Design a protein with these regions (language model features):
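A structural "flexibility-hinge" signal
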Residues: 1-209
Length: 209
């Protein structure tokens, strides 16, 4: 599966129906909101200036499994809240306001769905890395490869400009992050991360056999 398909996979009709019931919103509006939010999150993650933060976010959530009970886990995860604050920052308010207005849902509902979209995006990136044996630079390259697809993911009437991502497709001028050892797939119980904090240029994904 492609990176985008891995992210979209858990955002299925069952989750949309469950979210609509919990949030008191219509399924069609929840679907439109998630259809706007996950490309927005992916777009922010793919921005050149966010490279180091994205790798740190993957490390921060490396032991978390959002593949099941995504709605509940994302909503109750302090790690996801921290990542939204750190990576999306002030841009999150811009995104939430436009998505809330565009989809006619409450801003509090949009906030909850942003957590879901962020968790799904991180989980999709981790799965893509595991399946393809990607190191840090490989992950960033994969994100860069998918930038051009993001505008087409947005629902009709929503644009990169609405989400504050008008510069997303500009050419990358950042210095690449130094590669680390490839990520090999292991079960969640086997995952053990060693992050070398004494080096800002490298981080290592290691798994206990």
């Amino acid at each position: 599966m492609s990176l985008i398909d891995l992210i979209k996979h858990p955002l299925n009709p069952e989750l949309i129906s469950e979210a609509a019931i919990q949030l008191g919103e219509s399924e069609s509006n929840v679907s439109k909101a998630l259809g706007s939010l996950f490309p927005a999150v992916l777009g922010v993650f793919a921005q050149h200036s966010k490279q180091k933060d994205v790798i740190n976010a993957l490390l921060e959530t490396s032991s978390l499994d959002f593949s099941e009970n995504l709605l509940e886990k994302a909503g109750n995860s302090p790690e996801i809240e921290n990542i939204i604050s750190k990576i999306l920052g002030e841009k999150s308010e811009h995104i939430l306001s436009h998505v809330s207005e565009y989809t006619n849902i409450n801003k509090s509902s949009a906030e909850n769905l942003l957590k879901v979209a962020t968790a799904a995006t991180l989980e999709g990136i981790k799965k893509c890395a595991h399946e393809n044996g990607l190191d840090n630079q490989g992950i960033l390259s994969k994100l860069a490869e998918n930038r051009c697809f993001i505008p087409a993911l947005l629902p009709a009437g929503m644009s990169l400009e609405h989400l504050g991502l008008e510069n997303l497709l500009e050419k990358n001028t950042e210095i690449p992050v130094e590669s680390s050892a490839p990520i090999t797939h292991k079960t969640k119980e086997e995952v053990k991360i060693l992050h070398q904090e004494n080096s800002e240029k490298s981080s290592f994904w290691r798994y206990r056999d």
